[in-house]
Swiss-Prot record:
Source organism: Prochlorococcus marinus (strain MIT 9301)
List of residues binding GTP 2: 183-190, 230-234, 295-298
Keywords carried by this UniProt record: GTP-binding, Nucleotide-binding, Repeat, Ribosome biogenesis
Function according to Swiss-Prot or TrEMBL: GTPase that plays an essential role in the late steps of ribosome biogenesis.
Family, per entry: Belongs to the TRAFAC class TrmE-Era-EngA-EngB-Septin-like GTPase superfamily. EngA (Der) GTPase family.
Protein name: GTPase Der
EngA-type G domain boundaries: 4-169, 177-352
MF annotations from Gene Ontology: GTP binding; ribosome binding
Record: residues binding GTP 1: 10-17, 57-61, 120-123
Amino acid sequence: MILPTIAIIGRPNVGKSTLVNRLCQSNDAIVFDKPGVTRDRTYQNASWGGKEFQIVDTGGLVFDDDSEFLPEIRTQVFLALEEASLALLVVDGNQGVTDGDLSIAKWLRNSSCKTIVAVNKCESTTLGISLASEFWKLGLGEPNPVSAIHGSGTGDLLDLVIGELPENNIQDDEEKIMMSIIGRPNVGKSSLLNSICGEKRAIVSDISGTTTDSIDTLIKKGDNHWKIIDTAGIRRKKNVKYGTEFFGINRAFKSIDRSDVCVLVIDAIDGVTDQDQKLAGRIEEQGRACIIVVNKWDLVEKNSSTIYQVEKELRSKLYFLHWSKMIFISALTGQRVDNIFEHALNAVNQHRRRVTTSVVNEVLKESISWKSPPTKRSGKQGRLYYGTQVKNKPPTFTLFVNDPKLFGITYRRYIEKQIRVNLGFEGTPLILLWRGKQQRALNKEVERENIELIQKD
């Protein structure tokens, strides 16, 4: 089951994200002393008193201003409240009650959601009680003084929170498939997330950099539960200023690290850029499963051969991910969006797959029968004794040979291709470890494991 949700709501810059990080004991919400840092609604898991729940951080709520992203942020806050079991209204104790606080309180009183008031920036316990008392006038019950920075009062606040939450059954992240949506700014990542979820889950704008957090969304497709991470667009380092975008990009790279599968989004109009290639390299370096999604395909003028020509051109520049499935979609119209889950699931399954040693050696034996290991000018020839899979995520194989130096890059690529093609490894990188060992040192090992050597000295 999806965990019960607490929606963090309040005016801009009252310390909502700092409080989220304190309650969740993490730094996943971007904290920066500037109003409007949080735009989308972002989710984190937390636990207290034996209960686990989900906290959703929302953007600063303003009712009387329609500039910049404020209308879109309002929509995100409304959606967060609709799915919440409890609302936590955060106010600034130093500023006292403002017109903005009163407007939000009136809106919350008219909703059906239970609300707890957290009076933030009450660093002094004695003064905090005095500052908090002013917020009785919001009409939402007893105000609770806390300090998000120092942590004071947050334990009592969490006691109140869990007392209002329903019982829940917990599904661990280990049971979910973690899928991150990766790409440059404005390639349509948030539009894709919205299309996948069937709702306006992330703010969509033609302005680059709209998403500054990594956004986690839970969704069920068939028998599988997915956690989808929409990341901030990743730019060249020289174009990144210190601030929220800097933190967001670092968060996006961390999203790659915690993913089971990455969806690399490419703009069909712009094609592959240098930054796309760097992202592809990053995914390959981290050993993640991946599918390539070419978005905005509806905007391309095409004939019967266009898709083949475009795929060939894109693949020539994304050679890091030559093993990835490529899908041409339109996040705007929904064209082929549902195919993403099918191919992503296949990539994850291949990424987690294990193959028996006997099967690996059948493939290797067949491969060298078609193309023998190279022979040096000195007359010394490479010998491949046997291979075995030593781990998965990604599939990693150790190949025992007489001398790794005798196996050049061309032959190594040939063997990798044979393993991939014959065993059906699509959507995942493969790692081949070439280990030099004398045959006599292997004899006891292969006898114990009942392995037949492919080649002998």
